[in-house]
Amino acid sequence: HSTYFVQLGGRRLLIDPVFSTYASPVFFANRAFEGTNLYTAEDMPDIDYLLISHDHWDHLDYATATALRSKVGQVVCPLGVGAHFEAWGYGKETVFEGDWYSVLEGKDGFAIHILPARHFSGRSLTRNKTLWAGFALVTPERRIFFSGDSGYGKHFAEIGARFGGFDLAMLDCGQYDENWRYVHMMPEDTAQAAEDLRARALLPGHVGKFAIAYHTWDDPFKRIVAASRGKPYRLLLPLIGEPVALPIASDGEILRWWEAGR
């Protein structure tokens, strides 16, 4: 869905992990597709930074967060989201909360930037009591961008200009509908956002595990392939668990794994 394990600058980062079989407050809603639950919290090594983009159920999972607690060095999240972690037994000193454009700086030029997104937040009956965000992961050699959930907007071009482009952009590209395109990008928006960000490679996300919209499960893959033709970035569509190594070659064949068995 939107879970990424990243090794960068000698650090291990885990982004929006959801290892549960459902992404909702009840077990019978938003259940994972068969065959997509390949990993558990027990499979994860120690994590230097746990990044959470916002507190929707498909990005912040109680069972996953509590199972990871002993392995996490620092939680990084937008304003208000840290309260969930403190309620779930994380020490306050381990949680870094920030507004848009806040920066958590480490040694050797490593930095995590909390950046704007166009979305909303809330769990159960609460709504918009916490902030939502994307992240830029920066070292002297590499720059990676994660959009979180976001509709298309001018913030992508502004972020691209601010950072001078990215080696890899991991962008929202699923669970969309014309009725809510201001909070979730259509695949064509995702392609434009990658170009705005000056990304050398695009890895579309928010797709492949949960059905939270009305489109078919493979529609995002087909549409992003079409929308990316002629774009200046390389499109990456890995299988769940397939590693992607930086730097990424400028071209390469797309394995259309979603067409297997047809």
Cite the ranges covered by each PLM segment.
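Divalent metal-coordination and catalytic microenvironments
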Residues: V6, D16, H54, D61, ...
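Active-site metal-binding loops of divalent metal-dependent hydrolases
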Residues: P17-F19, D55, A117-H119, G148-S150, ...
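Cap/insert and terminal regions of metallo-dependent hydrolase folds
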Residues: M44, Y49, Q74-E86, R143, ...
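Catalytic core of the metallo-beta-lactamase
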Residues: S2-L8, E105-F166, R181, M185-D189
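Metal-dependent catalytic neighborhoods of phosphoester/phosphodiester hydrolases
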Residues: D61-S70, I212-K222, P247-I248
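Metallo-beta-lactamase
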Residues: P78-R142, R223-E242, P247-A249, E253
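Short hydrophobic/aromatic-enriched beta-strand-loop microsegments
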Residues: I15-D16, V75-V76, K92-W100, D167-D172
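Pre-active-site segment of Zn-dependent metallo-hydrolases
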Residues: T3-D55, Y62-A67, C77-G80, G122-T126, ...
